[in-house]
């Protein structure tokens, strides 16, 4: 067999930001926020084809993230600025993720198989410094998960195939959602992070029929635990806090259809993406509504037209039906775009 390939890489990212907020209403408020992110990562991957039918993959990755953010709010009282201790704080966050994976690819006359397993360990430590009016708060979170994947493709006649895929995935909270700082949109709406957020864990299964390069039709199922959504909390003082939190679970199931450059005529190609998805959210016990569920149709169509040698046009549109999204219901949304193109200067310009 051919020799294997080993590659390794290291990365460093530094991000710095500063932001001032000035809110002029019945109470004048000024906020000074700054912070920085340092990210270090390294990874190594091995690909080893040890026969004509089998290829082995393995790899490891580690990353370290350090975040230090500071928010300093002052409120105008009379002729002087006074610190607002309810909104001001300092937040430090450290995260270490270590992961390793193995995967085996097998190819036979009519069957292709990919099976893998990834192990991830995450360690998080955070601290929100207090002041004379707020206590210091610190938190830690350690968790380890296994993520299996499986993909089986069976080749039929005439270039068509059947595909079965399964994968367990993780979606971690973004760093802004974990940041406990208060961001003031206006005097009635505050945005605040949540240091207690847990990652989303999902199981994804799809059975599909693939007709050459023209279209794909399938049935997909998804179960997600600890779904992260934006919640809206009324504090009773005419202020609504928008904050991310974990829901109990979400189930999504439904058929999907997609085409790729389907030729309707000699001058007209179309791409279609359509689905009918059932979403069901189970909400925490403290919500008045315990379940939010709905069937949602979605369709997107892209048409490409060619006229003679130098003229072409495009017509694109989509429609997303009424959808359940956490504790909210999103009303239908649609859009249509059109464009026309003319080649000039013997094709060197448009």
Predicted regions and their residues:
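Surface-exposed extracellular loop regions of Gram-negative outer-membrane beta-barrel proteins
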Residues: 16-18, 68, 77-80, 123-130, ...
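Gram-negative outer-membrane beta-barrel transporters
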Residues: 221-222, 246-320
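Conserved C-terminal beta-signal and adjacent last beta-strands/turns
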Residues: 150, 292-350
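Residues that define the transmembrane beta-barrel architecture of outer-membrane proteins
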Residues: 36-40, 94-98, 142-146, 201-205, ...
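Face-selective signature of the C-terminal outer-membrane beta-barrel domain
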Residues: 1-127, 155, 215-219, 251-277, ...
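Outer-membrane beta-barrel signature, preferentially recognizing the C-terminal barrel domain
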Residues: 88-97, 141, 170-218, 223, ...
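Extracellular loop and loop/strand-boundary signature of outer-membrane beta-barrel proteins
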Residues: 25-32, 82-90, 132-139, 186-195, ...
């Amino acid at each position: 067999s051919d020799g294997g390939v080993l590659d390794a890489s290291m990365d460093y990212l530094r991000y710095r930001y500063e932001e001032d907020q000035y809110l002029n209403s019945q109470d004048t408020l000024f906020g000074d926020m700054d912070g920085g992110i340092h990210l270090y990562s390294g990874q190594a991957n091995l690909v080893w084809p040890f026969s004509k039918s089998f290829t082995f993959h393995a790899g490891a990755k580690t990353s370290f993230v350090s975040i230090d953010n500071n928010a300093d709010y002052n409120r105008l009282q009379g002729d002087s600025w006074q610190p607002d201790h309810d909104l001001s704080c300092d937040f430090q966050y450290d995260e270490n993720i270590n992961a390793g994976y193995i995967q085996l690819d097998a190819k036979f006359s009519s069957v292709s198989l990919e099976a893998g397993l990834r192990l991830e360990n995450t360690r998080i430590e955070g601290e929100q410094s207090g002041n004379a009016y707020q206590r210091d708060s610190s938190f830690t979170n350690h968790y380890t998960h296994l993520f299996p994947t499986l993909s089986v493709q069976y080749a039929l006649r005439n270039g068509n195939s059947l595909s079965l895929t399964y994968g367990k995935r993780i979606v971690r909270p973004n760093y802004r959602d974990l940041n406990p700082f208060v961001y003031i949109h206006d005097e009635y709406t505050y945005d605040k992070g949540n240091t207690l957020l847990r990652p989303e864990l999902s199981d994804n299964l799809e059975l599909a029929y693939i007709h050459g390069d023209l279209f794909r039709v399938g049935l997909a199922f998804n179960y997600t635990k600890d779904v992260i959504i934006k919640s809206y909390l009324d504090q009773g003082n005419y202020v609504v806090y928008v904050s991310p939190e974990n829901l109990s679970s979400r189930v999504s199931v439904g058929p999907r259809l997609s085409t790729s450059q389907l030729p309707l005529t000699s001058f007209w190609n179309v791409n279609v993406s359509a689905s009918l998805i059932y979403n069901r959210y189970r909400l925490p016990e403290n919500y008045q509504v315990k379940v939010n569920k709905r069937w949602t149709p979605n369709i997107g169509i892209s048409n490409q037209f060619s006229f003679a040698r130098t003229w072409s046009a495009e017509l694109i549109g989509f429609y997303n039906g009424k959808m359940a999204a956490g504790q909210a219901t999103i009303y239908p949304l649609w859009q249509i775009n059109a464009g026309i193109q003319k080649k000039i200067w013997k094709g060197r310009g448009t």
